[in-house]
From Swiss-Prot:
Pfam families: GKRP_SIS_N. GO terms for molecular function: carbohydrate derivative binding; carbon-oxygen lyase activity; ether hydrolase activity. The gene is murQ. A lyase-type mechanism (elimination/hydration) is suggested for the cleavage of the lactyl ether bond of MurNAc 6-phosphate, with the formation of an alpha,beta-unsaturated aldehyde intermediate with (E)-stereochemistry, followed by the syn addition of water to give product. The active site is at E86, E117. Specifically catalyzes the cleavage of the D-lactyl ether substituent of MurNAc 6-phosphate, producing GlcNAc 6-phosphate and D-lactate. It comes from Clostridium botulinum (strain Loch Maree / Type A3). Homodimer. Pathway: Amino-sugar metabolism; N-acetylmuramate degradation. Disulfide bonds: none annotated. This is N-acetylmuramic acid 6-phosphate etherase.
Length: 302
């Protein structure tokens, strides 16, 4: 257990702006919370340089066969699992490429597992169970920056030569000193003292969104601002796939539906076939040669 006292943590300090939150009308209470929430985006903005460095590292890792692994406890762990779980349907990647590990295992997603966050060894065990390697990226998430479970993971990852990133909301935390890249949006005291699922959790979610989204953009999963590697696994996504191809190419719905059927709803290939006027096999050959980057594939045939 690290010996940082809670009274030194920004996230545990008392918020002077909300001391009377229990004595005001409902609307005023919500305004207090909303005023605090407005500070989150500004805090994240101040960390963009560090976030950019992290995105570059993650993107390179993906291109070299590495993975993005989130570790955290409680709210922080849940946010990692949430971000990871959205990557396969959104970007068509395997469920192994971006993974979230929460202290205490899957059951801790729904019910707190007291004490799980206090074990460094438990995180090391969890990382070994997924064959974590030096080619992977480890993102440790903890509002306080002092969670032993996460610190154990960061230390282990450093020890095997992997890139480590910390996402905390306290400056100069132990985690930030251990990680290769420190991302620490300082959102200030919570509206409810110590309730880091609020501003700190929101800031962490914003950062994780940027990390995964930025890396997917860097690795050709986006064309313009369209998610061209999504998996059309339900009716809504089938319709979205059609709209994406129409938006990307300007083609009529009838042509788009025909091409999508031909490619088994491979959105990226469908777009390139329409843009290049090539047959399926030739289009796929060129797209594969350019590692799935539509822009680069189009340049090759221009």
């Amino acid at each position: 257990m690290t010996n940082i006292s809670l009274d030194k943590l920004v996230t545990e300090s008392r918020n002077e702006n909300t001391k009377n939150i229990d004595r005001v009308e409902t609307l005023e209470m919500l305004k207090m919370i909303n005023d605090e929430d407005k500070k989150v985006a500004e805090a994240v903005e101040k960390e963009l340089i560090h976030i950019a460095k992290a995105v570059e590292k993650i993107g390179k890792a993906f291109l070299n066969g590495g993975r993005l692994i989130y570790v955290g406890a409680g709210t922080s762990g849940r946010l990692g699992v949430l971000d990871a779980s959205e990557c396969p349907p959104t970007y068509g990647v395997s469920y192994d490429l971006v993974r979230g590990i929460i202290a205490g295992g899957e059951s801790a997603m729904f019910k707190a597992r007291e004490g799980a966050e206090d074990s460094k060894k438990l995180c090391i065990k969890d990382l070994k169970n997924i064959d974590f390697s030096k080619n992977d990226i480890l993102v440790g998430i903890a509002a306080s920056g002092r969670t032993p479970y996460v610190i154990g993971g960061l230390e282990y990852a450093n020890g095997i030569g992997a890139t480590t990133i910390s996402v905390t909301c306290n400056p100069e935390s132990e985690m930030s000193k251990i990680a290769n890249i420190s991302i620490a949006p300082v959102v200030g005291p919570e509206a409810i003292t110590g309730s880091t699922r609020m501003k700190a959790g929101t800031a962490q979610k914003m950062v994780l969104n940027m990390l995964s989204t930025g890396a997917m953009v860097k690795t050709g999963k986006v064309y313009g601002n369209l998610m061209v590697d999504l998996k059309a696994t339900n009716e809504k996504l089938v319709e979205r796939a059609k709209r994406i191809v129409m938006q990307a190419t300007g083609a009529k719905r009838e042509q788009v539906e025909r091409i999508l059927e031909e490619t088994n709803f491979d959105v990226k290939l469908s777009i390139f076939m329409i843009e290049s006027s090539l047959e399926k096999m030739k289009a796929k050959e060129i797209l594969d040669k350019n590692k799935g980057y539509i822009v680069e594939a189009i340049k090759e045939i221009s």
